């Protein structure tokens, strides 16, 4: 059987992969087999961390809201605020509440005092 050298198609495929990993260090940007492995690994990490980012931001928002709310009343916490928001049928998500908590604390205090009543 004769040997097939794979020609320009394989070269184009490898060049495309090399462009993806061009910023990697050492053999990870030079050798075809390790390029393939590192590309797969990078894509897996990117996919995992996109989900992780959503969790991390939600935790950050909750921490910010809780820190500001505890400064207002003696025995008031994040969980009570969220419970009272749902009870009052106010639709404010955690991202918006965190932005209000950072930029305008008095506004958040007013919201929390109104829903307590």
Swiss-Prot record:
Q: Which SUPFAM superfamilies match?
A: Ribosomal protein L20
Mind listing the GO biological process terms from this record? ribosomal large subunit assembly; translation
Plastid: is it a keyword of this entry?
yes
Main location per the UniProt record:
plastid
* Entry-linked InterPro entries: Ribosomal_bL20 (IPR005813), RIBOSOMAL_L20_CS (IPR049946), Ribosomal_protein_bL20_C (IPR035566)
Q: Which UniProt keywords apply?
A: Chloroplast, Plastid, Ribonucleoprotein, Ribosomal protein, RNA-binding, rRNA-binding
PANTHER family named among the record's database cross-references: 39S RIBOSOMAL PROTEIN L20
This chain's function reads: Binds directly to 23S ribosomal RNA and is necessary for the in vitro assembly process of the 50S ribosomal subunit. It is not involved in the protein synthesizing functions of that subunit.
The record's annotation in NCBIfam families points to: rplT_bact (TIGR01032)
Kindly provide the name given to this protein in its UniProt entry: Large ribosomal subunit protein bL20c
Organism (species): Citrus sinensis
Task: Please name the taxonomic classification of the source.
Answer: Eukaryota, Viridiplantae, Streptophyta, Embryophyta, Tracheophyta
């Amino acid at each position: 059987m004769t040997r097939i050298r794979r020609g320009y198609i394989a070269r184009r495929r490898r060049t495309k992969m090399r462009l993806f990993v061009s910023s990697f260090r050492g053999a990870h940007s030079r050798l075809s087999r390790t390029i393939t492995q590192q590309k797969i690994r990078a894509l897996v990490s990117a996919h995992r961390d996109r989900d992780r980012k959503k969790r991390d931001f939600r935790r950050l928002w909750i921490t910010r809201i809780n820190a500001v709310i505890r400064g207002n009343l003696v025995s008031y916490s994040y969980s009570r605020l969220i419970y009272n928001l749902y009870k009052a049928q106010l639709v404010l998500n955690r991202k918006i509440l965190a932005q209000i908590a950072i930029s305008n604390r008095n506004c958040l205090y007013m919201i929390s005092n109104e829903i307590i009543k």
